[in-house]
Amino acid sequence: MRTGIIAQKIGMTSVFNDKGERIALTLVKVDDCQVVGHKTLEKHGYNALVIGVKDKKISRVTKPMKQVFANAKISPKTKLKEFRISEENFIDVAASLEVDHFMAGQFVDITAITIGKGFAGSMKRHNFRGLEASHGVSISHRSHGSTGQRQDPGKVFKGKKMAGHMGCNQVTIQNLKIFAVDKDRKLIMIQGSIPGHKNSYLSIKDAIKKISITI
């Protein structure tokens, strides 16, 4: 199991293949992605690499983190993330990770934060059908209906689907196919959509359920 990388979502586009089919693509950019540190089985209980991306002003870094970046002999990074790896896949600290870490035709898993939707009703948040449009229903057309029972149990059970904050959740999309890799522009083109807003950060790693590569 090797490390993943941190990328930044640029936006979406589309291309046509040889059959005339339109393929939706998400463009992600990999820029200044470096190894910041190691986590070892002997010291931390597991093997992992700490990856950082995008340079950050030294004035905006806390004193403890300044020492971390100084020990790694790299410039401060905006985003840090750990990736679990097997023992034989350690990479030297300060080594750079480029877009050619992946290849066209490879399947990957992508983890990102979904776009926040604010306070949403039950129909939007949980796909409820709502109440009747007429026949005695007044004002409550988009409500979720009953929330509990009666004096016993006298409470609303945890996990009850109700209106509330929607979005801003960490989501992993599995088995997305890499359409192409543009090394000059530092871009990876991925088939399909990816969670998150424009310029948000996401992590890309090898698919754990589908490892076949078709070029």
Curated annotation (Swiss-Prot):
The modification N5-methylglutamine is found at Q151. One of its GO terms (cellular component) is ribosome. The keyword Ribosomal protein applies. Methylated by PrmB. InterPro entries: Ribosomal_uL3 (IPR000597), Ribosomal_uL3_bac/org-type (IPR019927), Ribosomal_uL3_CS (IPR019926), Transl_B-barrel_sf (IPR009000). Residues 136-155 are annotated as: Disordered. One of its GO terms (biological process) is translation. GO terms for molecular function: rRNA binding; structural constituent of ribosome. Signal peptide: none annotated. The keyword Thylakoid does not apply. Belongs to the universal ribosomal protein uL3 family. NCBIfam families: L3_bact. HAMAP family: Ribosomal_uL3_B (MF_01325_B). Part of the 50S ribosomal subunit. Forms a cluster with proteins L14 and L19. One of the primary rRNA binding proteins, it binds directly near the 3'-end of the 23S rRNA, where it nucleates assembly of the 50S subunit. This is Large ribosomal subunit protein uL3. It comes from Rickettsia canadensis (strain McKiel). The gene is rplC.
